[in-house]
Amino acid sequence: MKQRLLENRLRAGFVKWVTQGNGLAVVVVVFFFAFGLLLLTLRQRHIDNQELLVRQDAQTSVGDMQLRLRGDIDYLLLLAKERADEKLTPESFLRIGSQYVADHPELINITWVDKNLIIQNVAPLQGNRQIIGLGISLPEPARASQAARQTRQPVYTDVFEAIQGGYSFEVWVPVFRDNQFKGLFAGVYSLGKLLKYALPLQVQKNNYFEILDENRNVLAEFGVRQNVFPQVSKVAPISPFGNGVTLRVTRFGNEFWSQNLIVLILVCSGLAMGLVYFMFARL
């Protein structure tokens, strides 16, 4: 009996406390706490979704770049076979090589080098004529050409700064006939053009791209630094480059805390507070 009487007094005291307006503060605090927790949960889900998308886009980008490079090697191997079989003349090389470079703008040119490592021809000729007759003197091309000759396999240079400016890399493919070295072909690339032309369009429109060296210095970039998530990016190694060269993909998009969302939060908060006040005013 006494316990029931005590419970009734406590209940009556709580109702009185609520009706006096003290409960309004508690309800408002609980509402905003729950609302804030909901927003934080939604924001984390938003970030997780962006991270998943940028990770997938990075994998797609690296995969497409490698497929593009693999296709170029296959073409250079075909040229090497035609040259070894003495079916490729300088004239036909200029014609088909120039067309291939036009169709694959990540390439600057394709260079024909003889067994003495002297440049004999280059496709396209326009803009590259001045290198004919030169030897292979730059450290990375010299290393890769010798390695390709020794291994009889295509060999990439590391990324290096080109004389013309910007960063470049090359792939060297040897030419042998009856175990006799005949020379090489070199595919000469622009790192910036590789980013621009070797990536799928659906990935380009959603991301900002950078190629970095081992010290995280930017070697090439593509895209506009606008509306990007600095915290939502993915770094992936680019095979076959050495020296820790990586591709960093940063996601485009709007921040979770956008202006429209903030306005919506303020409106909802105002409506909720007005509703709570109206309910307690009628008690």
What is each model feature region?
Residues 18-27, 70, 128-129, 133:
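An N-terminal domain-start capping segment
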